[in-house]
Regions:
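Phosphate-binding loop of NTP-binding sites
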Residues: 27-28, 65-69, 78-154
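N-terminal leader/targeting and accessory segments in enzymes
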Residues: 1-99, 103
Length: 154
């Protein structure tokens, strides 16, 4: 699947580690995008603005369903609940919802080992990475531990 097919306006929702990673990924792809966060205060707003010139930044009261419905795609960070009324209204209006892992799997052309479950994921992930490195393999470990998926080497 082409991550850009039919998408003209993107919004990165949630500006923690994963959201900023998604924004950097959009930059590397040459995509136009804006940024928003549900928090009423963003202590690093100036840093975000200067790092993503050409993108608009919305947060606090500016975060609304009307804002989100203006976009073709929302790249929603895992820390932002999809059950939020604003996001649910955007979904109802036909806005595509995706996340960093979806974008990663659409664009990654390297072998991937995905580890899921309730308990022990970080430990198993770390051990698998170390075993593969010990076997002489080129390995990048990331996702919800350490490096966000979209910041992993290509």
């Amino acid at each position: 699947m082409n991550a850009n097919k039919g998408i003209n306006k993107r919004m990165v929702v949630g500006l923690g580690m994963t959201g900023l990673s998604a924004a950097r990924w959009c930059q590397r792809q040459g995509y136009a995008f804006d940024l928003c966060d549900t928090r009423s205060e963003l202590k690093n707003a100036d840093v975000i603005r200067s790092g993503f010139i050409g993108s608009e930044l919305f947060y606090g009261e500016a975060f609304s369903a009307d804002l989100l419905k203006k976009y073709d795609q929302l790249i929603v960070s895992p820390g932002v609940a999809l059950a939020l009324p604003e996001i649910q209204q955007a979904i109802a209006a036909g806005v595509e919802i995706t996340g960093d892992i979806d974008l990663f799997k659409q664009t990654c052309n390297k072998p991937v080992i995905a580890i899921t479950g309730s308990n022990g994921k970080s430990t198993v992930t770390t051990l698998v990475g170390e075993l593969l490195q010990a076997a002489g393999k080129s390995v990048a470990v990331g996702g919800n531990i350490g490096v966000p998926a979209l910041d992993l080497p290509e």
